[in-house]
């Protein structure tokens, strides 16, 4: 698990709804100068993003970073694939877990840690519709219990 997370810039709110997160991994992102300025301004979208292992390297795909306003000619394509910085052992471990198991790698958060952009990846398994309904039902029951306890304790 990740210890100290710095300034959270973006979160993938649908990830916990659509997937069951098995494990989390912290990775650095290779960004250009104008991209890091956009990330610091919280102009990043993780909605449809995912990560993939190709040729022994990890890549972040479909993550949109809006071009920096004053970037003019140095701005990159907003939807380009970006390299993730992981150790070889971590990449091998992830690729072994991803092989033929129906698992995927989903970005959960992007945050700044000591001036560097980091992404929290979740090793995830997709949920079925009935799993989603069950988790919603469980969440509502917990809210009702908490509400009743609050009312009971305030008497």
Swiss-Prot record:
GO function term, MF aspect, one: RNA binding
Top-level taxon of origin: Bacteria
PROSITE patterns: SSRP
GO cellular component, one term: cytosol
InterPro entries noted in UniProt: SmpB (IPR023620), SsrA-bd_prot (IPR000037), SsrA-bd_prot_CS (IPR020081)
Chain's role: Required for rescue of stalled ribosomes mediated by trans-translation. Binds to transfer-messenger RNA (tmRNA), required for stable association of tmRNA with ribosomes. tmRNA and SmpB together mimic tRNA shape, replacing the anticodon stem-loop with SmpB. tmRNA is encoded by the ssrA gene; the 2 termini fold to resemble tRNA(Ala) and it encodes a 'tag peptide', a short internal open reading frame. During trans-translation Ala-aminoacylated tmRNA acts like a tRNA, entering the A-site of stalled ribosomes, displacing the stalled mRNA.
Keywords tagged on the record: Cytoplasm, RNA-binding
Family as reported in the entry's similarity comment: Belongs to the SmpB family.
Pfam families linked to this entry: SmpB
GO biological process, alphabetically ordered: trans-translation
Protein location: Cytoplasm
Protein name: SsrA-binding protein
Native species: Streptococcus agalactiae serotype V (strain ATCC BAA-611 / 2603 V/R)
């Amino acid at each position: 698990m990740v210890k100290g997370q710095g300034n959270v810039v973006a979160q993938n709110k649908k990830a916990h709804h659509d997937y069951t997160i098995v494990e989390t991994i912290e990775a650095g992102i290779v960004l250009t100068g104008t991209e890091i300025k956009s990330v610091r301004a919280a102009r990043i979208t993780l909605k449809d993003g995912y990560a993939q292992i190709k040729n022994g390297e990890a890549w972040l795909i479909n993550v949109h970073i809006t071009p920096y306003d004053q970037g003019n000619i140095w701005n990159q394509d907003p939807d380009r694939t970006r390299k993730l910085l992981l150790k070889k052992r971590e990449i091998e471990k992830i690729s072994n877990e991803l092989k033929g198991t129906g698992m995927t790698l989903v970005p959960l958060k992007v945050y700044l840690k000591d001036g560097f952009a980091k992404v929290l990846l979740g090793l995830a398994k997709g949920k079925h519709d009935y799993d989603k309904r069950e988790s919603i039902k469980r969440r509502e029951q917990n809210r009702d219990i908490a509400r009743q306890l609050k009312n009971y304790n305030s008497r």
